[in-house]
Amino acid sequence: MRKIVNLTKPKGEIVRLMIYNDDFGTYLFGYNKTVDCSSEFDELFESENDAMESCETEYGIKKEEWTEIPNPEPNCQHDWINPVRIKGRQNGNPEFGKLEKRINGNWIEFESIE
């Protein structure tokens, strides 16, 4: 499960954080929007505990403030809340810069909000 939190006191332009665990460690994603979008930054930690301690120090976020959300679906971007993927990634022909999101079971190309 991923974890997400909106900051009550934004730090610079950062207003939302997400934590995601995989085989390499724990990623912390930072966002400048509260709507579902790609992150502004990512940082890799050895463990979820290390990432959460960093968030408490840097952003004042306590462990109980995080909300769990499902992990991304296969071939989907880890930093988006809803299923979003790079077009063609699922068949080994990624078209970087082109994104698709799943709407009512269909993958639809869209332009990301920047």
Model-derived features: positions:
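Short, mixed-charge low-complexity intrinsically disordered segments
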Residues: 61-114
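Short aromatic-glycine-(Arg/Gly/Cys) micro-motifs in beta-strand/loop hairpins
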Residues: 13-39
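A short, charged, amphipathic alpha-helix used as a generic interaction element across diverse proteins
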Residues: 41, 45-62
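A C-terminal-region feature
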Residues: 26-30, 35-36, 50, 58, ...
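Short, hydrophobic/aromatic-rich segments at coil-to-beta transitions
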Residues: 1-6
